[in-house]
A protein has these predicted regions:
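A broadly conserved sequence feature marking short terminus-proximal activation segments
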Residues: 1-6
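Local cysteine-cluster metal-coordination motifs and their immediate loop/turn environment
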Residues: 12-14, 66
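Cys/His-coordinated zinc-binding microdomains
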Residues: 14-17, 32-35
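Short polar/charged helix/loop
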Residues: 50-212
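Short linker/helix segments within small regulatory modules
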Residues: 20-28
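Short, Lys/Arg-enriched N-terminal segments with co-localized hydrophobic residues
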Residues: 41-52
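Short metal-binding segments enriched for Cys and/or His
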Residues: 36-40
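The −1 position to Zn-ligating cysteines in a subset of zinc-ribbon hairpins
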Residues: 9, 27-33, 55
Length: 212
């Protein structure tokens, strides 16, 4: 009689345990699925943000005059247009002439002063040399003159993705931006840089890279 009473209880206990295991398993699967869906949603939002990030590298010979002027003029233009969150903008040199013991020189004082006259700060900027890895990192690699372009192509080993351009090509000009280190015409260089950067921003808008 005792055995007859115990056996049904054991079966009931086993049945309850199995049922609980199934319920727990279902809960785990549901939670994991929800987690995966949530993660996918987050990843999608992140990827969408990265998709509209436009990476621009301005390049000149020494990275102390023209390319830093272009970098900070472009930063101001995109900030004024409320596009700053969509851009990563920097500048570099094709040479190491302004880099000593691994430390780059700051922006050349007359170039810095010209930017300051237009309310633009370049504080903290130091020269650095462009590398082959920059080709993969940036969407647009923009030189100031034809010599810059030749040196860029040498460093990158070509331009298979069509990322390299001269700044004034965006205004439809074949003209180079002269190096004010030699000309002393920092105001002229600023105007050329501003014209080129403005046209470049317009190009991005017209080609659907950023919303207008």
């Amino acid at each position: 009689v005792v055995r007859i009473m115990i056996l049904p209880n054991v079966k009931d206990v086993v049945s309850i345990i199995l049922t609980m295991k199934m319920m727990i398993l279902c809960c785990v699967i549901t939670v994991k699925s929800a987690g995966i869906m949530g993660l996918s949603q987050l990843d999608f939002e992140d990827l969408r943000g990265y998709a509209i990030m436009i990476k621009v590298l301005f390049i000149c010979h020494g990275n102390i005059c023209r390319s830093p002027m272009a970098e900070f003029v472009m930063k101001k233009l995109v900030s004024d247009a409320n596009f700053a969150d969509h851009f990563q903008i920097a500048s570099a040199a094709t040479s190491t002439e302004e880099i000593w013991n691994g430390i780059g020189n700051p922006v050349y004082p007359p170039a810095k002063a010209e930017l300051a006259r237009h309310g633009i700060s370049c504080e903290g900027k130091r020269a650095r040399q462009v590398t082959k890895a920059d080709y993969a990192e940036y969407d647009y690699l923009i030189g100031m003159d034809s010599a810059n372009i030749r040196n860029m192509l040498r460093i990158f080993g070509g331009d298979p993705d069509g990322k390299v351009a001269r700044l004034l090509s965006y205004v439809g000009s074949e003209r180079d931006i002269s190096d004010p280190w030699y000309t002393g015409e920092f105001g002229t260089t600023y105007n050329d840089v501003l014209e080129g950067c403005t046209a470049f921003l317009r190009y991005l808008q017209q080609n659907g890279r950023i919303d207008t």
